Amino acid sequence: MAPVLPVVLPLQPRIRLAQGIWLLSWLLALVGGLTLLCSGHLLVQLGHLGTFLAPSCSFPALPQTALAAGTVALGTGLGGAGASRASLDAAQYPPWRGVLTPLLAVGTAAGGGLLTLALGLALALPVSLNQGLEEGLEAALAHYKDTEVPGRCQAKRLMDELQLRYHCCGRHGYKDWFGVQWVSNRYLDPSDQDVVDRIQSNVEGLYLIDGVPFSCCNPHSPRPCLQSQLSDPYAHPLFDPRQPNLNLWAQGCHEVLLEHLQGLSGTLGSILAVTLLLQILVLLGLRYLQTALEGLGGVIDGEGEAQGYLFPGGLKDILKTAWLQGGLAHKPAPEEAPPDEEPPKEVLAEA
């Protein structure tokens, strides 16, 4: 059987190959560690912002997959660096001969598969992030008033912290607060006619006002923050509703969070692409180095040329050999076949 993609490797190219693999392996370990840091950072960010994502959003799968892929890449890089360094010394290489095959198998199957999957998620999942933030922020605004409802007691605090930290207001702007009841019922006087009129003015029976929570206010504004009657042009003589309100955060939280998370996922995707490229180069180099040294008995400075290859034969030949070996393993040879047992003498006598 002819080997797949054979390469003739004299002495000096073998040494340069081992040295190059050593350098690439350390780069892979470095980038793998960077992948761990970036995916861990994104996972922590999603832990803080998970309240504002819809439960059906699958975006958190990206940092989880990237975390596993970075771990395998880091291990592959460290293993490749150790194996390539040991290959330069005939006394140190024998212990690594039994490690290289499992390392190549795990690096190809687990590392390559996880990196490819994580890179695909980095390209595909940011599209679903838009809808996930839409639904999550809509629910967050609707539950802002539920400070005494079990399971939603922290909704107000989390939304206020989000708007203050990311300098945003509402979902797409401060007017989003006009369409939801954000004042808790415990602060409403049912005997107040204005409260009754506002509740009866909509079919949902909500207390709707043209105001915003305090967390929408920009503390750097030189003027006092205007929070109520924002749609009434006569309520605030110095405020024109048709002009940008410098007292309130101009951007909506959807736009800010989408840009923030897509930026993190884009950075992680770029690192994953570099990691996948280095993983392929290291695994290919290790495979050629392994097969070349096997032909020399594990001695890199052995006399003569060595041939490195990916597979000892084509895919068809490999499958055929495996099939034949599997069939022969279950079929005993003629000389090993057990002799036919003779029937008991009692049975012969009765016959």
Swiss-Prot record:
It is a multi-pass membrane protein. The gene is Rom1. GO terms for biological process: camera-type eye photoreceptor cell differentiation; cell adhesion; detection of light stimulus involved in visual perception; photoreceptor cell outer segment organization; protein heterooligomerization; protein homooligomerization; protein localization to photoreceptor outer segment; regulation of gene expression. Disruption phenotype: Knockout mice are viable, fertile and grossly phenotypically normal. 50% reduction in maximal rod photoreceptor response at 9 months of age. Progressive thinning of the retinal outer nuclear layer becomes evident at 1 month of age. Evidence of rod photoreceptor degeneration, shortened rod outer segment (ROS) length, increased ROS disk diameter, and progressive disorganization of the ROS at 1 month of age, leading to near-complete loss of organization by 2 months of age, however organization returns to near normal levels by 4 months of age. Rod photoreceptors progressively die by apoptosis. It comes from the Eukaryota. Belongs to the PRPH2/ROM1 family. CDD domains: peripherin_like_LEL (cd03162). Residues 45-64, 126-263 are lumenal. Plays a role in rod outer segment (ROS) morphogenesis. May play a role with PRPH2 in the maintenance of the structure of ROS curved disks. Plays a role in the organization of the ROS and maintenance of ROS disk diameter. Involved in the maintenance of the retina outer nuclear layer. The keyword Transcription regulation does not apply. It comes from Mus musculus (Mouse). Gene3D superfamilies: Tetraspanin. This is Rod outer segment membrane protein 1. Keywords: Cell adhesion, Cell projection, Disulfide bond, Membrane, Sensory transduction, Transmembrane, Transmembrane helix, Vision. Disulfide bonds: none annotated. Residues 342-351 have a biased composition (Basic and acidic residues). It is found in: Photoreceptor inner segment membrane; Photoreceptor outer segment membrane. GO terms for cellular component: photoreceptor outer segment; photoreceptor outer segment membrane. Residues 329-351 are annotated as: Disordered. The chain crosses the membrane at residues 20-44, 65-84, 103-125, 264-286. Residues 1-19, 85-102, 287-351 are cytoplasmic.
